[in-house]
């Protein structure tokens, strides 16, 4: 399964366009970020010692859009112009814009949640939802996926290259899952997301020259939610639900542990702290790069476990 996915990646024009497009747009996004004030200044609890632009979402969004449009123009089987794709692109635009505003001016969790709910509404309107569930439940589950995934990726974006690399590893897993499930929009979007993350990682790995920012982490989280929802549409076997959650095991577990930890300490679950899994790794002597690479290894293990679950179902819809 994974070998088929690797062959699909290496032979995919949209993947390579996403890699090149995002890599080339990232320095431009950095300059734009400095000009519009989307800059992360050094401070307590931060590892960088100089102001760094946090406008990476602009580069990711630009690279993704170029790759998707290029795939459509080239007649890529995995990426085509459809109402579902329009819904995905619209939702992606919403979370990117809301996130960028937060990176520039700062905003409240409520405003960010409203943006994420609006993006989830775009998916529901174009039919990206678990159709086999009763309509009210299917409509409720989509925002849960979007809010959960977006905030999980935001929380794990604490070290240079961490969120981007973990997302790339998960995206490769979703390429395989989409192919096994026979859902072209999942495998196609996963290919493009993988390429964009790798292109951005060239500038974001330690020492980072640019950060994802809320625009980038929310965009990645939204697209991962789309992939998870796309896998479970029209599938009754519960293993199709479980496999995507296992693939994203690291950010999900880190988020769950953060909520529990903060409640125990009588803190707001929205309060930042240094108790994340990756922070503990740094404290125990792994260092910045070592902690990131260790998290990558955990991400690979999660993807492997998710693919084992999918393999136990067999190819094609259940």
Segments (PLM) and residue ranges:
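Alpha-helical transmembrane segments
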Residues: 2-37, 61-97, 136, 141, ...
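PRPP/pyrophosphate-binding module of the type I phosphoribosyltransferase fold
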Residues: 150-151, 160-164
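Mid-bilayer segments of alpha-helical transmembrane spans in multi-pass integral membrane proteins
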Residues: 96-100, 121-129, 151
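Single transmembrane alpha-helix segments in multi-pass membrane proteins
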Residues: 146-154
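Juxtamembrane helix-capping/reentrant segments at transmembrane boundaries
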Residues: 41-55, 278
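Hydrophobic alpha-helical hairpins/lids featuring a short glycine-rich hinge
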Residues: 86-116
């Amino acid at each position: 399964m994974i070998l088929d996915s690797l062959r699909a990646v290496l032979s995919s024009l949209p993947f390579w366009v996403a890699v090149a497009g995002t890599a080339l747009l990232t320095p431009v996004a950095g300059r734009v970020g400095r000009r519009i004030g989307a800059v992360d200044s050094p401070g307590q609890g931060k590892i960088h010692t100089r102001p760094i632009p946090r406008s990476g979402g602009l580069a990711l969004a630009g690279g993704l859009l170029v790759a998707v449009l290029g795939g459509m123009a080239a007649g890529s089987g995995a990426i085509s112009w459809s109402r579902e794709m329009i819904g995905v692109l619209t939702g992606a635009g919403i979370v990117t814009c809301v996130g960028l505003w937060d990176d520039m001016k700062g905003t409240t969790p409520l405003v960010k949640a409203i943006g994420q709910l609006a993006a989830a509404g775009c998916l529901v309107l174009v039919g990206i939802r678990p159709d086999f569930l009763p309509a009210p439940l299917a409509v409720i589950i989509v925002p849960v996926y979007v809010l959960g995934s977006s905030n999980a990726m935001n929380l794990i974006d604490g070290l240079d290259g961490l969120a981007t690399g973990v997302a790339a590893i998960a995206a490769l897993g979703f390429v395989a899952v989409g192919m096994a499930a026979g859902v072209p929009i999942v495998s196609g979007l996963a290919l493009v997301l993988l390429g964009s993350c790798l292109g951005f990682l060239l500038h974001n790995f330690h020492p980072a020259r640019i950060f994802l920012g809320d625009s980038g982490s929310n965009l990645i989280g939204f697209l991962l939610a789309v992939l998870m929802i796309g896998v479970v549409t029209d599938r009754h076997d519960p293993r199709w639900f479980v496999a995507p959650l296992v693939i994203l095991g690291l950010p999900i577990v880190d988020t769950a542990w953060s909520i529990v930890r903060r409640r125990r300490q009588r803190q707001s679950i929205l309060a930042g702290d240094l108790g994340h899994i990756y922070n503990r790794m740094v404290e125990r002597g792994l260092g910045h790069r070592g902690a990131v690479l260790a998290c990558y290894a955990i991400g690979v293990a999660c993807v492997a476990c998710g693919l084992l679950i999918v393999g136990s179902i067999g190819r094609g819809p259940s």
